């Protein structure tokens, strides 16, 4: 491969392609299907495409919330959340939970899912999902660009 075969991409200058290469190249991305609830007992279930594992020992996972959303606020309040595996069989239900709804609307009900109790956290998990990680918050970080300017995204 020669230099002329490469496409150089500097985000501030755009890319001239049909689709954003950042999203297309970093794929497939696992979905962080995050269940949480607030201190008033309002349940939230939402998918996040910026999700991954970050450390083996101790096991650490994380997701990025673009703009401050209910999930981030709930987790900051209660210090707990659950990551639920979104399988192909659950894709329709997962997409239904992406709807922008009022804080007191239960996405489990919208998607026809069952909220099941967990063993280590008070947050419910998706009973239909074959895997659920019960998580405790360690930190929330507001992301920033290389120029030091704060982004409207939290990890």
Positions of PLM-derived features:
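Polyanion/phosphate-binding surface patch
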Residues: 48
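Active-site-proximal mixed secondary-structure blocks
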Residues: 1-44, 52-155
């Amino acid at each position: 491969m020669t230099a002329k075969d490469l496409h150089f991409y500097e985000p501030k200058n755009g890319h001239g392609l049909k689709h954003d290469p950042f999203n297309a190249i970093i794929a497939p991305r696992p979905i962080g299907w995050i269940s949480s609830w607030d201190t008033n007992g309002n349940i939230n279930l939402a998918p996040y495409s910026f999700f991954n594992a970050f450390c083996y020992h101790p096991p650490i996972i994380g997701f990025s919330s673009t703009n401050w959303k209910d999930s981030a606020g709930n987790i900051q309040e209660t210090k707990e959340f659950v990551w639920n595996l979104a399988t192909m069989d659950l894709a329709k239900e997962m997409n239904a939970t992406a709807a922008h709804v009022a804080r007191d609307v239960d996405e489990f009900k919208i998607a026809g899912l069952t909220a099941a109790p967990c063993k280590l956290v008070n947050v419910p998990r998706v009973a239909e999902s074959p895997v659920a990680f019960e998580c405790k918050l360690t930190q929330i970080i507001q992301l920033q660009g290389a120029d030091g300017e704060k982004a409207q995204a939290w990890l």
